[in-house]
Each structure stands twice: as C-alpha cells, then as structure tokens.
Curated annotation (Swiss-Prot):
Residues 90-122, 301-317 have a biased composition (Polar residues). Residues 132-191, 194-257, 398-459, 767-826 form the SH3 domain. Residues 80-130, 266-319, 647-694, 725-759 are annotated as: Disordered. Keywords: Cell projection, Cytoplasm, Golgi apparatus, Metal-binding, Repeat, SH3 domain, Transferase, Ubl conjugation, Ubl conjugation pathway, Zinc, Zinc-finger. It comes from Xenopus laevis (African clawed frog). PROSITE patterns: SH3, ZF_RING_1, ZF_RING_2. This is E3 ubiquitin-protein ligase SH3RF1. The lineage of its organism: Eukaryota, Metazoa, Chordata, Craniata, Vertebrata.
Length: 826
C-alpha cells in the first residue's frame, strides 16, 4: 500500500480531515481530532463519543494520545531524511520532505489544525519515495553509473524500485531521478509486486459459429490477455478488454504469474503415477466442461495428431505452429477412450513406420525373415532378454510407431519422459502441438515428450548372430527385417539407416546366421490383411490360432515353405510334401507346435502362423533347449520346387482361400478385438496393389536366376548376391535330410508382416474416390499428413473411424492423411 492511500485511512470520522499527533483517543478506543472534540464540548456542554455515544467524564486535554498513530506518523516523517543528503529537510525539490514537513520544526499543537486542508492535498500528491510501503532497495555500495541513463546513488540510500529489467538490472528512482542500476549493488527491502497473470497470443484464434462458440474469447496474434483461471486440461478462461471467455492454452504464452495460476488450477484428477500424462484425462475434463462448452472443443486428440499443450507455455515447450483454430473444435471426442485404453501399454507393441512404401512382389528366393525392430535388435545386442508384456486391447486404428531420440531431453513435469540420445520410444499418440505420447522401450515408462526431439525409425537390414537372441527379437516387435546369410569369416558391416547404424554380422561357427538360409515364405493378399489382426493378438489367442491353422492345414497341400538348393530342385519333392500335409499332425509340445505350424502351413493360414510366431512368450525361449535336444536334427532341409504342379497347386489354394476367408477373418478378429468385435479387419487401400504384385511375382518367379536374391530394405527391392556354394557348404548334410527335419541351431522366424498400409501411398487404387474441397488450410504435423490449402481438391480414398481421411491431393498428386473436418464433399 502506498503512502497516499495509507494517509487517506488516517482521517477523523467527524471532519474527515487527516489525523495528526494531537488526536485524542476516548475510553471507548475511538480516536478523533482534538478540534472536533473541543467543538462538541463547547456546543453540547458534555462530551459523548460520536460513534458509540459513550459519555466521557474527563476533559479533552486530559485524554491520552493514540500511541500507534503517533508512531506511524513519526515513521513517515523520519523515513525520507535517511534518503536525503544529510539534514536537508527544507529541500523543496524533494516531494517526500514536503509531505513530511507537516509535523516538523515544532510541537504538535492545535494551530496546525488550520493547515489540515493543505495537508490533505499534500497527502494525495505522488507517492512518497522510499517509504516501506513501496518496493524499495537499500544501497550497499556507492554507484556512479557507467553509461548515460544509469542511476547514481551513495551507500545507504533508499531506492524506489520501478521495474526489473532482468535478473541483473533494475530500473529505479531516487530524489526524482530515474535510472538503471545493478542488482548486486543493493539489498532488496521490499520486492516488486508480482505482475498480473497475463498471456501473449501466439496465433490468431477466431470462431466461425459465433452462436455455438459464444463463450470463446477470440483474439489476434500478439494480443495480451489477462488470465482468470484454468477451465480444464486444454482450455483457460481469460479477459481481453471488456470481454471474458475461454481460449485454448496451446495458442498463448503465459508469464510467470499466469504459469503459477495455471499450475494451481490444474485438474485434480491428474494422475501422478508412472505412465500418466495430462493428455490421458481429457475424459474428466470433458465432463467438467460440458456445462460451458461443446464436448468436441474440449478434446484436442485424434489418433494421429493430438494435443498435450495444456501446460505447454508453462515449461517453455517448443511446439509446432498451428494457425487455424479448427484443429481443436474438429478433434475427435472418442479419442479419449482410446487414450485411456493405451495407458497400460508396456514396452512391447507392434511397431510401424511413419510412411512405409509398398512391398515389391515376392521374389523367388528370399533370405531368412526375422521379425525384429531396430530398437529390439539393439536391446538384443546388449543381451537384455526379458519377458515381453502383451497388449491385449491395442486397436488397429491406433498403430504405434517406433521413434529414436536424436536429442536428450530432461523432463520438467511429472507426466514427461526423459529422452536419452539413441533411446527407442514407441509412439501411439501424436499431439497437435507437436508433442508425442508414448512409452520408452528401455524403461517401459509412459509419458509425453517433444516430437522434434525424436525421429522415426525405418526398417533396417540386420542380422542377429546367436539363435537365442534372434528368437528374443522375434517376439519383441513385428517389423520385418530380412537377414542375408554370409559365409563364415565375413567381415562385419555397418549399414547406416536414417542416421542409426545397425551392425550386419555373420556367424563364425560355420552355421548360417540367424535362421534357415534362403527359405522363401509366400503370403497371399488375403493373408496380408489378416496379418494386421494377428500382430495384435495375445499369447493365448495366438496359440488358439495356431491350433486352428494346424487343423485347417490338413485339408490343403502345403507349398508355402520349401528349401532352396544350389542345383535346380527336383520336381518329385512336391508330391512328397503334399502327401505329408494330408496327414493329421500328432500332438506336440508348445514350442514344437509353434514351429510345426510356422513351417508346415498353407498360404491362407500364414497369418495365424504369423500371430503365433510374433506372440511367442519368453517361456518358449526357456523350452528351446529341450526341443533342440529332442529333435536331434540340424541344418535346413526344405526345398522349393518352382514348377507347373506348384503353380497349379497355388491356383487351387487361391480358390479354397476365398471360401475360408470369411471364417478365418471372423476367428482372428473375434479373438483379437474383444472390446469392439467386428466381422472383418479394416480394409487396406493397398490390398489390390499388393495382390497384383503377388500375381506378377508368380509369373516372374521362374525368370529370376538362382544367384540373385532380392532383399527388401525399407519396403523396396534391392539386388543382393548370395554364394549358394557357401550356403550349401555350411549345411553339408542338407540333401540327405527329410523335408520335415529341423535345424536345432536355427530359430524359426515368423512370416513377414504387412506394413502399415493405411499410411502408404495409394496411387494405383482402383476404388472409386470422393471429391472433397478444402474449407480451411491445414499445416501438416508429420510426414504422413497432407498440406491443405483453402480451395484445394482432394480425392478421398478412405475415411477412418477417428474422423481422419486418407486421400490424394489434386494439386501435387501427394497422398496422405488429413482431418475430415477441414474438407467438404462436392
């Protein structure tokens, strides 16, 4: 409180003039000026308290003075003299001494009451400088000033603080002179008051439907808003001019006072335990805000582009620019339910690339296919093999992606994750403000982190040297990696892929590394669709799928997995395999059943084998030694016979697969989606392209030379030569073994999983497309999204459940994702 306001309170209740040291206090403890009390006695012949009418029996001169009032006035009078130049009380340039001169140079007598009107005017003059009620500091040293504009003072002077320039400089005033001075030259007696909670607009925020959004507070960029309170996780209430409304937190930058207010008003339902984040409570904030705002405006989440900017400015997070406000009003309310389901996600989940290209046609002879993501391969190389938790309720509409930290990040809030450079993260939600929500594949913790600190991990060409490590990485993730066998003693090569180096090593024990050399696994287009479902299955569901697949395989010839030899394979091996597959398989132990189902399975049932292989628990690794010793077999003894009987058998299988497709779809979709059963998995827009590619591959299969092995790297075909003599030399007894024998040193890899086709390019899609016009421009938040400009025409291929569309932009021919609320059908 400044001095003028304080002196306004020290006034007589009768005459409303300022009290001085001559004021008297009555026995009832009410204080009045002496002049008023004398006037009452002279007119009434008695003295009663004007406030409570209590009779006073003594005279006015006998009444005591108010000690507290005297001390207060004394302090106001004496304080300015310490800041002066040593006793210059009569200096007229010092307004502070002019006000203090009311009670100086003489006793406090009744004659001064005649000057009360003049004193009252002086009391309401500009604030006294240096009084304790004002922010002030005491000079510890003499400061002469080094530049024009600096404030000069001597040791012991009292300086009134006006504002703080930064942590090292203040702007203050002394004796009517303003200037700057360093902080370390003074001692703060009373600090500056906290600034009001305000925020600065980073983007324009406009509302289209003023009737529906009447409680929103529109503003322009660089506007200064006064923050009133926090409404929920994503919205705050503020004032601009004479208007009060709510606005998105991600559109503004708060000052220090507003940050504290936002933190204090944080929703009480926010979890502080591991795996929690502010984004996972949008369901609670929705209930709280229904009375004030449309439900959709409260949730800034979608399955691909979401928002966790609730305290973005509080911690100075670096977020991506979003100019149109429709991003918030058009977000999907059902995303909150999906987020709550994903809060229990562990360190293991199927990984997908941001924008994987289409797979080329299956080659005649491909190397061993090992399911291991780049993050899992790194874990396996450190010999960290532990139990892998399963994700039973992960839906295909929210496929997680693997990212790698390219910069370190220290968390500033409880719901944030620490990023270490090179650490792998599984991202299952991406926010509209550029923040990601995911889980660390190293610590299994769940939280949010800045998206510009990580980069997507693409598929890599890698080899796992020990068989046990290869099995461990096979169950960690479902990203397809192709392993190229190399002869013994080959040097170690490192292949840089997207800034991350993965070691490509070869075995030194004379056995082809990490699997069966050159085994060829073919899948039909139907099975590729089923792979999406099988990749999400739990262990028990995978076991049931394996048993079902084994039961179905006895009615159809098996020609999917066949060995490759250096010479042209004999055609007589095919009937032998077909005859063997007609027999009912005997009961096997759990590991043997998985391997039998993975190796002896027909084309339509390959997805079931993929589910079984990709969902193998750690218990299968422990039982590895038992079935190795019981089998007593070594080497790869499967041969592939590319001949007319094989092609005719494959054509027959395609017909049979169409009949049983619906049954398998219902079986797998019912087992993998308990919460939301559906009759078929989501339709892949690239299914027709892949089917065409696989049919073309069957026609071109015989034209490929035996020494040329196409290798799939990041979804593209690349030539790679393999020395068939060295491959066959590593397994000298290969030609003499039966087709059903297994190598006790070779782990069985699951079939390749179809890439995330919902994010791939759909340039050859033959389905009818709908034409949409862009209403509001949309800046892309990731590589998988399209940049929309107002007036653009988009051909929509697919509409997703979360409100996002997939289509091709007519302007540049690019294909990607975009929010459906930004376009209208034409």
């Amino acid at each position: 409180m400044d001095e003028s306001a304080l002196l306004d309170l020290l006034e007589c209740p009768v005459c409303l003039e300022r009290l001085d040291a001559s004021a008297k206090v009555l026995p009832c403890q009410h204080t009045f000026c002496k002049r008023c009390l004398l006037g009452i006695v002279s007119s009434r012949k008695e003295l009663r308290c004007p406030e409570c009418r209590t009779l006073v029996e003594c005279g006015v001169d006998e009444l005591p003075s108010n000690i507290l009032l005297v001390r207060l006035l004394d302090g106001i009078r004496q304080r300015p003299r310490k800041a002066g130049d040593g006793g210059s009380a009569g200096n007229s340039t010092n307004a502070l001494r002019a006000q203090g001169s009311v009670t100086t140079n003489g006793g406090l007598n009744d004659a001064q009451n005649t000057q009360s009107g003049q004193q009252r005017i002086q009391a309401r003059s500009p604030p006294v400088r240096g009084v304790p009620q004002l922010p002030c500091a005491k000079a510890l040293y003499n400061y002469e000033g080094k530049e024009p504009g600096d404030l000069k003072f001597n040791k012991g002077d009292i300086i009134v603080l006006r504002r703080q320039v930064d942590e090292n400089w203040y702007h203050g005033e002394i004796n009517g002179i303003h200037g700057f001075f360093p902080t370390n030259f003074v001692q703060i007696i009373k600090p500056l008051p906290q600034p009001p909670p305000q925020c600065k607009a980073l983007y324009d925020f406009e509302v289209k439907d003023k009737e529906a959004d009447k409680d929103c507070l529109p503003f322009l960029k660089d506007d200064i808003l006064t923050v009133i309170r926090r409404v929920d996780e994503n919205w705050a209430e503020g004032m601009l001019g004479d208007k009060i409304g709510i606005f998105p937190i991600s559109y503004v930058e708060f000052n220090s006072a507003a940050k504290q207010l936002i933190e204090l008003d944080k929703p009480s339902g926010a979890d502080t335990g591991e795996g929690s984040s502010g984004t996972s409570h949008s369901g609670n904030s929705q209930k709280q805000a229904d009375a004030k705002k449309n439900t959709k405006k409260r949730h800034s989440f979608t399955s691909l582009t979401m928002s966790n900017k609730s305290s973005q400015s509080v911690q100075n997070r670096h977020s991506m620019e979003i100019s149109p406000p429709v991003l918030i009003s058009s977000s999907n309310p059902t995303a909150a339910a999906r987020i709550s389901e994903l809060t229990g996600l562990s360190c293991s989940a199927p990984s997908q690339d941001m924008n994987p290209p289409l797979l080329p046609p299956p080659p005649m002879a491909t190397p061993v296919i090992t399911s291991a993501s780049s993050g899992a391969a790194a874990v396996a190389q450190r010999n960290i093999i532990g139990p892998v938790e399963q994700v039973p309720h992960l839906r295909t509409s929210a496929r997680p992606s693997v990212f790698i930290a390219i910069y370190p990040y220290i968390p500033r809030k409880e719901d944030e994750l620490e990023l270490r450079k090179g650490e792998m993260f599984l991202v299952f939600e991406r926010c509209q403000d550029g923040w990601f929500k995911g889980t660390s594949m190293h610590t299994s913790k769940i939280g949010v982190f800045p998206g510009n600190y990580v980069a997507p991990v693409t598929r890599a060409l890698t080899t796992a040297t020990p068989a046990k490590v290869a099995m461990a990485t096979a169950t960690t993730s479902n990203v397809v990696n192709l392993v190229t066998p190399t002869p013994p003693g080959a040097p170690c090569q490192k292949l840089p892929v997207s800034g991350v180096e993965f070691a490509k090593t070869s075995s030194t024990n004379g056995v082809s590394p990490a699997g069966v050399p050159g085994c060829h696994i073919q899948t039909s287009p139907q099975s590729k669709v089923l792979l999406h479902m099988s990749g999400q299955m739990t262990v028990n569901q995978a076991r049931n799928a394996v048993r079902t697949a084994a039961a179905h395989s006895q009615d159809r010839p098996t020609a999917a997995v066949t060995p490759i030899q250096a010479q042209t394979p004999a055609a007589s091996a095919l009937p032998q395999q077909a005859a063997a597959s007609q027999q009912v398989p005997p009961p096997l132990s759990a590991p043997a059943a998985y391997i039998n189902a993975a190796m002896n399975i027909s084309r339509p049932s390959v997805p079931a084998a993929s589910a079984a292989s990709s969902a193998l628990p750690t218990a299968a690794f422990e039982a590895e030694s038992s079935w190795k010793s019981s089998s007593g077999l070594s080497g790869c003894s499967f041969s592939e016979n590319v001949s007319a009987p094989l092609n005719s058998a494959a054509n027959k299988q395609d017909k049979d697969s169409k009949k049983e497709k619906k049954g398998l779809l219902k079986l797998l979709s019912g087992a993998s989606t308990k919460r939301k059963p559906r009759s078929s998995p989501p339709h892949s827009p690239t299914q027709e392209v892949e089917q065409t590619n696989s049919e073309a591959a069957a026609a071109l299969e015989g034209a490929v030379g035996p020494d040329i092995v196409p290798v799939i790297v990041n979804g593209r075909a690349a030539p790679c030569t393999v020395d068939c003599d060295s491959v066959s030399a590593s397994t000298p007894a290969q030609d003499n073994r039966k087709p059903a024998s297994l190598d006790n040193n070779i782990p069985i890899a699951p079939p390749p999983r179809q890439p995330c086709s919902s994010l791939g390019s759909v340039l050859n899609d033959s389905r009818p497309c709908e034409r949409y016009r862009v209403m509001v421009s949309y800046p892309p938040q990731s590589e998988a999204e399209l940049e929309l400009k107002e007036g653009d025409i988009v051909f929509v291929h697919k509409k997703r459940e979360d409100g996002w569309f997939k289509g091709t932009l007519q302007r540049n021919g690019k294909t990607g994702l975009f929010p459906g609320s930004f376009v209208e059908n034409i």
